[in-house]
UniProtKB/Swiss-Prot annotation:
The gene is rsmG. This is Ribosomal RNA small subunit methyltransferase G. One of its GO terms (molecular function) is rRNA (guanine-N7-)-methyltransferase activity. Belongs to the methyltransferase superfamily. RNA methyltransferase RsmG family. Its EC number is 2.1.1.-. Coiled coil: none annotated. It comes from Rhodococcus jostii (strain RHA1). Specifically methylates the N7 position of guanine in position 518 of 16S rRNA. Pfam families: GidB (PF02527). It is an enzyme of class 2 (transferase).
Amino acid sequence: MFHVEPNGGEPAEWDEQAAARQVFGERFDIAERYYKSLASDGVERGLIGPREVPRLWERHLLNCAVVGELIAEGESVVDVGSGAGLPGIPLAIARPDLRITLVEPLLRRSVYLAEFVESNGLDVLVVRGRAEESGVVKEAGGADVVTSRAVAPLEKLAKWSLPLIHEHGRMLALKGSSAAEEISRDRASLTRLGAGKLDIVECGVGLLPVPTVVVRAERVPKRRQRR
């Protein structure tokens, strides 16, 4: 497991390669292969926009991998709407102790994910389907953590995510500056759905120029929810 030592502020001169080596450690070579894959196959297959290539390390690989700060050793993780594998694949590379399942409905994306996982020996399961489908819940449900990135508004995301985790499991939604606004707007609906202990946390503080903003919620028994 990697550890980030907060230094109270942004580094004066950010070195993305040094940051990547700190986060991915001995598995940096796999992370580099993923970077190259996204920059080539990912663009060609329409999984990543060409304008994103210059900032793949900062905005994508590292932005996702640092969420591992919120996940305990050996936990099971379901990544909903995984797309090109974000955040699931960076997490799997940085944290081989985790048991990760990538859920993706589109064929071209799920094929890409399966190819990368197999060719790089990652202990990751790829499930093609939508998170809300009963077959997906049966195959991937009961997880400790469910992750997502830029998938949907919080209320809809909770409807898809909460059934995939056990009681007291956690939903980790990577969000941007709108996180507080989304919580304020959807809090009542989230409570009815069984999402408790809502808060906003930052990951990668002192490591990334812009920390990753995560909305965190715990699945709580609905009978304890108050109207």
